[in-house]
Amino acid sequence: MKLTKALVTLLALLRFNLVAPQAQAESEAELPAVQQLQAVDLAVYQTGEARQGAAADTQHVYAIDNFTLAKYEKAGGSLVARWQGIRGGAISHLNSCFAEKTQLFCANSNFPELPMASSVEVFATDSLRHIHSLSLGIMDEGSLTWFDRLGEGWLAGFAHYDGQGGTGFKDHRFATIYRYDQSWRRLGGWMMPDSVTRQMQPYAASGGALGADGLLYLSGHDKPEVYVLAAPRMGPKLIHVATISVNIEGQAIAWDDSAERVLIGISRSSREIRSFQIPPVVLPAGLFRLTEVNFTL
């Protein structure tokens, strides 16, 4: 009987050693190859303010600086409206915006102050007058850099930094993406994949926008790239499925919904707003679009 038990144990160990490497290989194989794609340049808009990002609607583009917004005509390039805050004021670091109907929704933070605090600021697109503010206060998530609609709620990105503006006990790897309901109650979220945070360090995502294809498009602080992420079948980390070369210098991006798959970004050095045709991204088998994820049990 003792010999039989020993043989059973030995066979179990041998079987484990044979299966474990195979299981590990299968797990590693679940990560798809990152698609390498190229955006096509479409248009350039000259501004004096585009240092943090840009937004767009059918007829206009919007330049974003720390406490300045400017509205320009697409057709002629004329300045239509401008909103100007004050240095050290309540709105001190506008990170990104997106246009929706008659409103411009913007992510604001107190960067580089500590502790990190954030707010959502809303402006009327006709005159750029400020019409609403939603304070998120101090959040463990980090500093709000971008947000977008997801269903009836919100998808938002929060930054942590290695240097200036960082807490000292959370580095760039703690940058997170969270899902909120329409009242900004947190429903869940994801880590960002290492292959993306490495490209953004020592900063985090400066811009983010959910595509019509249900995938998430992120831009970093300074690289001429946009990273495309999908939701995993299981686990807490988004999957990096594509990197798109884009003629920008990082900073915030937004979709121009007046055309299909047109993204806008900026050249910080020249303060230009630039638009691009973004190629289709193939969703690898076994992954999900963020719009397909169910945040209820």
What residues fall within each predicted segment?
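Surface loop/turn motifs at the tips and blade-to-blade linkers of beta-strand repeat domains
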Residues: L42-T47, Q84-G89, L134-D140, M191-Q201, ...
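Short, conserved, GDST-rich strand-edge loop motifs in beta-rich repeat architectures
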Residues: N108-A117, G157-F174, R274-F276
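Conserved blade-ending motifs and adjacent loop-strand segments that build the rim/top face
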Residues: P236-D256
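Beta-strand-rich domains and repeat architectures in extracellular enzymes and scaffolds
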Residues: A43-F67, H93
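A short helix->beta-strand "capping" segment at the edge of beta-propeller domains
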Residues: E28-G48
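Beta-rich catalytic cores
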Residues: E49-A50, S92-H93, M116, E141-S143, ...
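Blade-loop segments of beta-propeller domains
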Residues: L79-F111
